[in-house]
């Protein structure tokens, strides 16, 4: 019996890890990866950090260059797909080539959510999703240049830190009343706001751009009436899933390809993962997790589902952010206002805990990354704690 052919569409973390997971889980059939980027699949997190700060930055590949050939995975880089061929099971490229598939994994990622008022500036305006974006930003982030960043989420704040470290004059504009409002708890939001302000970043909350004039400098008029002059304008206000191919194939989409817990779409032969995917939960709600670890997890889950193997258990959601000399790691449930703090954030060393009826459901570490491993185990097991003991620095966490 002829082994099936699996095609992976995409060139990022989820795509590369899907290939690795399929081989690790025993798939020996024909395996192809198609990407519109010319690079081998590379890590995205460094784009807003080391790729802007290091003297001679190099892309960090997800898998070693020799892995692909050694594992008999056919790479098709720098190609554009015309259609997925859902009905014919023939993926078609714009150059006319067609490739048969039995199962398909879509990991086309996402683009920056557009902001038409700024997009009209053309090359004067920047977003950050790919290596080319980082290279262009690196060229313009020069000392003493005025940089305006729209959006104070994770990417916006990481860019603010990197631009400040490159000795730029940075202003951040945020529509909400706080920074990192979607994915950090209130005490961490307050810490980050203060941290950036102490570094010289001007952060304007509850504000937005109303008018833009392009000249020698970009003139930005805010809702507050203030006018800013910028040499460089960057925005990061969310993502727009690269779902066009899936939409044209009549797959269910909702700013993302809708998948179930097995990463399966409405077509049982087509799977999706990473930033392009959005999961329908048991209660019918749609949930997207935009993180490096989620891309890895969904790649492993999809590979298992494709091969008819038991699905791996999902660990608590986890991501990290490096800003200035700080490493923050977020794990578990970030919702809720009643967080406990172990340590002193003013010394840039602390852990915030989220207890619900004594059960640890989430945590954020500040320059305490070594503690994430036991915290992950505690969250997974539903461990209960005495709050006073948890925040007592005289008691080692590992002894609890």
Curated annotation (Swiss-Prot):
Pathway: Aromatic compound metabolism; 3-phenylpropanoate degradation
Keywords: Aromatic hydrocarbons catabolism, FAD, Flavoprotein, NAD, Oxidoreductase
One Gene Ontology cellular component: 3-phenylpropionate dioxygenase complex
Record bears the keyword 4Fe-4S: no
Binding site for FAD: 5-36
EC number: 1.18.1.3
GO MF annotation list: 3-phenylpropionate dioxygenase activity; ferredoxin-NAD+ reductase activity; oxidoreductase activity, acting on NAD(P)H
Taxonomic superkingdom: Bacteria
Record text on subunit structure and interactions: This dioxygenase system consists of four proteins: the two subunits of the hydroxylase component (HcaE and HcaF), a ferredoxin (HcaC) and a ferredoxin reductase (HcaD).
Family: Belongs to the bacterial ring-hydroxylating dioxygenase ferredoxin reductase family.
HAMAP family found in the cross-reference section: HcaD
Function description: Part of the multicomponent 3-phenylpropionate dioxygenase, that converts 3-phenylpropionic acid (PP) and cinnamic acid (CI) into 3-phenylpropionate-dihydrodiol (PP-dihydrodiol) and cinnamic acid-dihydrodiol (CI-dihydrodiol), respectively.
Record's protein name: 3-phenylpropionate/cinnamic acid dioxygenase ferredoxin--NAD(+) reductase component
Natural source organism: Escherichia coli (strain K12)
Record gene name: hcaD
């Amino acid at each position: 019996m002829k082994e099936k052919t699996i095609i992976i569409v995409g060139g990022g973390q989820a795509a590369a890890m899907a290939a690795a997971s399929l081989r690790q889980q025993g798939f020996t059939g024909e395996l192809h990866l198609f990407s519109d980027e010319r690079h081998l699949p590379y890590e995205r997190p460094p784009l807003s950090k080391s790729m802007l700060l290091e003297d001679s930055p190099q892309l960090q590949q997800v898998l070693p260059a020799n892995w692909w050939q050694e594992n008999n995975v056919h790479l098709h880089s720098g190609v554009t797909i015309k259609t997925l061929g859902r009905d014919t099971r023939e993926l078609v490229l714009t150059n006319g080539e067609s490739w048969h598939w039995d199962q398909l994994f879509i990991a086309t990622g996402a683009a920056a959510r557009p902001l038409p008022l700024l997009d009209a500036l053309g090359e004067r305006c920047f977003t950050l999703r790919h290596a080319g974006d980082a290279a262009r930003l690196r060229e313009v982030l020069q000392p003493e240049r005025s940089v305006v960043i729209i959006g104070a989420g994770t990417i916006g704040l990481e860019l603010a830190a990197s631009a400040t470290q490159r000795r730029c004059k940075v202003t951040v504009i945020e529509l909400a009343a706080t920074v990192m409002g979607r994915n950090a708890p209130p005490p961490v939001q307050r810490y980050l706001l203060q941290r950036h302000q102490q570094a010289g970043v001007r952060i304007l909350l509850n504000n937005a751009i109303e008018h833009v004039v392009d000249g020698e400098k970009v003139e930005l008029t805010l809702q507050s009436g203030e006018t800013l002059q910028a040499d460089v304008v960057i925005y990061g206000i969310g993502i727009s899933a690269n779902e066009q191919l899936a939409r044209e194939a009549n797959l269910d989409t909702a700013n993302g390809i809708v998948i179930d817990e097995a990463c399966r779409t409405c077509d049982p032969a087509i799977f999706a993962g990473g930033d392009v995917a959005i999961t329908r939960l048991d209660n019918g709600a749609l949930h997207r997790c935009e993180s490096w670890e989620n891309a890895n997890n969904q790649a492993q889950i999809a590979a298992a589902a494709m091969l008819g193997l038991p699905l791996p258990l999902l660990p608590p959601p986890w991501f990290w952010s490096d800003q200035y000399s700080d490493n923050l790691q977020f794990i578990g449930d970030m919702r809720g206002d009643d967080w406990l703090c172990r340590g002193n954030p003013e010394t840039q060393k602390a852990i915030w805990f989220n207890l619900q009826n004594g059960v640890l459901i989430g945590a954020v570490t500040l320059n305490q990354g070594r503690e994430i491993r036991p915290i992950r185990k505690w969250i997974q097991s539903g461990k209960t704690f005495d709050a006073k003991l948890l925040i007592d620095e005289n008691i080692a966490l590992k002894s609890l």
